[in-house]
From Swiss-Prot:
Pfam families: Pep_deformylase. The gene is PDF1A. Residues 191-196, 236-254 are annotated as: Dimerization. Substrate binds at residues 123-126, 187. Binds 1 Zn(2+) ion per subunit. This is Peptide deformylase 1A, chloroplastic/mitochondrial. It is found in: Plastid, Chloroplast stroma; Mitochondrion. Its EC number is 3.5.1.88. Its main location: plastid. It comes from Arabidopsis thaliana (Mouse-ear cress).
């Protein structure tokens, strides 16, 4: 993302980011800025050919993926894998671990590079390899100062949201560090047009490998912890809708409607 944008472009980016993993209020604030965000694509099996992965899969050859564009018609066409849409088995099956000795290989490094580009182009704050049709345990995430600057201060405080640099994790293993939880609305690049409230742990620790193959450990809290849980869920074949609070699922257009009677309130639980 460029550092210099006119107001319309900045508002568009805010609208898209807010609908990925931000609470309702930010999404409602920017609803008036609308741009097309999807167009038909091809099967995730085409993505797998980019990385010399086996194309035999339980996925239907007719399964279509959704390609999310970050800036509408202003985006130039680039040669990147498509984001796979919900319903494709690659999103609902457990991903395979990467051999640590292969992390530095050209194939794995290309997968990581493409994941970063796709995440930023969307734009989103996280992406898992299965979302580009690659059934491997790799995630990428980042939350920039620019993204956070668009959110209201009270929202940032409620989320315990702090910026962090690009993070790449291979074979991540996540564990909660406390029983404290919070409830906020989530979205997903693979489930376009819908949102639901999901309860997540506020503090987690994640171990794994970085893109150089070195062992790393990340202690995360607040919004970063939520993003990590969301992306690690993808590696086990789970989407946020598999963990959503019942009766909170809704379209983006209905984000401003009140929660159904009996639903828990948003925020720390």
């Amino acid at each position: 993302m460029g550092l210099h944008r006119d107001e319309a472009t900045a508002m568009e980016t805010l609208f898209r980011v807010s609908l990925r993993l931000l609470p309702v209020s930010a999404a409602v604030t920017c609803r008036s800025i609308r741009f097309p965000v999807s167009r038909p694509g091809s099967s995730h099996l085409l993505n797998r050919k980019l990385y010399n992965l086996p194309t035999s899969s339980s996925s239907s050859l007719s399964t279509k993926a959704g390609w999310l564009l970050g800036l509408g018609e202003k985006k130039k066409k680039v040669d990147l894998p498509e984001i796979v849409a919900s319903g494709d088995p690659v999103l609902h099956e457990k991903a395979r671990e990467v051999d640590p000795g292969e992390i530095g290989s050209e194939r794995i490094q290309k997968i990581i590079d493409d994941m970063i580009k796709v995440m930023r182009l969307a734009p989103g704050v996280g992406l898992a390899a299965p979302q580009i049709g690659v059934p491997l345990r790799i995630i990428v995430l980042e939350d920039t100062k620019e993204y956070i600057s668009y959110a209201p201060k009270e929202e940032i405080l409620a989320q315990e949201r702090r910026h962090f640099d690009l993070m790449v994790m291979v074979n991540p293993v996540l564990k909660e560090r406390s029983n404290k939880k919070a409830l906020f609305f989530e979205g997903c690049l693979s489930v376009d047009g819908f949102r639901a409230a999901v309860e997540r742990y506020l503090e987690v620790v994640v171990t794994g490998y970085d893109r150089q193959g070195k062992r790393i450990e990340v202690n995360a809290s607040g919004w970063q912890a939520r993003i990590l849980q969301h992306e690690c869920d993808h590696l086990d074949g789970n989407l946020y809708v598999d963990k959503m609070v019942p009766r909170t699922f809704r379209t983006v257009d209905n984000l401003d409607l009140p929660l159904a009677e009996g639903c828990p309130k948003l925020g720390p639980q």
